[in-house]
Amino acid sequence: MGEGGAQRPLLTVIAGPTASGKTALAIALAQRAGGEIVSADSQQVYRHFDIGTAKPSSEELAAVPHHLVSAVDPMEAFSAVEYQRRADAVIAEIAARGRPVFVVGGTGLYLRVLLHGVLEAPGALPELRAELEALAAGEGREAVHRRLAEVDPETAAKLPPQDLVRVIRALEIHAQTGVPASAFRKAHAFAPDRYPFQLYVLSPPRDVLYGLINTRTRMLFERGLVEETRELLARGYADSAPMRSVGYVQARAVVEGRMTREEAIHDTAQETRRYAKRQLTWFRKEPGAVFLAPPYEAALPLGGCCSP
């Protein structure tokens, strides 16, 4: 499923949409194989943002060594290129210990840069484009530009509101990759297939996945997402990248009195379902991906996973 240099370790990659069960499967497999986990999640990489990013619990982190979780200050710029650099270093250390490497996450851009290095620009999203064009027609191009500024202030600072085509394009890239267009474009091309790898994409039935997302969203709010957000805002993280992610945007609206708690839960679940759909669309384009339906461990090819 991927060919790399002879000295590069085999990576077992567990990918898939949010709430699909990646963490639980990866921990079970890593425990069985005596391996370590490298996260490929563009939000869990930040410190302090714990509840809203659904980080592994303290028990899960203790069960198997995890890397690139809570590794970056929230105010630090962290691109796909930087992720690749840090992941390469961690993978080399794990391999030097003679332990299997499991890469786990739903940020498709991180995985593509790590495995292949080659970034293909994502295609258009007709529904999103139509929505944004309607917003521009109804409320002005500045309204679309403000939406870009919320998720990608760096690109927004470089584009005037009048450049609607490029503003919409930047929002399309963010919608499909989960990272700002500025970070996407900073990533450089490298030789494809940088590691030998086995890529498994968790793909539960849509109704099951959406049910899991709805349940987890409510659980995150019950665990204190609004309170965590209030504390993070007080600590000065209002302008940080993770504060612009789904869940924190809505929780902040509750803190600031712009949404009720139930409205925030509903909106977070809705936006998360949309993101999960885009994640699956992304992974369907990945060469060599093996899609698994639950129960995942039973669906794994015999002898095809997790060799030291």
From Swiss-Prot:
Signal peptide: none
Keyword tags: ATP-binding, Magnesium, Nucleotide-binding, Transferase, tRNA processing
Gene field: miaA
Top-level EC class: transferase
Gene Ontology biological process terms in this record: tRNA modification
Keyword Electron transport (UniProt): no
Interaction with substrate tRNA (site feature) positions: 107, 129
Cofactor(s) demanded: Mg(2+)
NCBIfam families: miaA (TIGR00174)
Protein name per UniProt: tRNA dimethylallyltransferase
SS bonds (residue pairs): none
Region: Interaction with substrate tRNA, residue numbers: 41-44
The UniProt record lists the keyword Oxidoreductase: no
Entry's EC annotation: 2.5.1.75
Family designation: Belongs to the IPP transferase family.
Pfam families linked to this entry: IPPT
Gene3D superfamilies reported in the protein's UniProt record: 1.10.20.140, P-loop containing nucleotide triphosphate hydrolases
Species the sequence originates in: Myxococcus xanthus (strain DK1622)
Sites where the protein binds substrate: 18-23
Assembly with partners or alone: Monomer.
GO molecular function: ATP binding; tRNA dimethylallyltransferase activity
InterPro entries listed in its UniProt record: Dimethylallyltransferase (IPR039657), IPT (IPR018022), P-loop_NTPase (IPR027417)
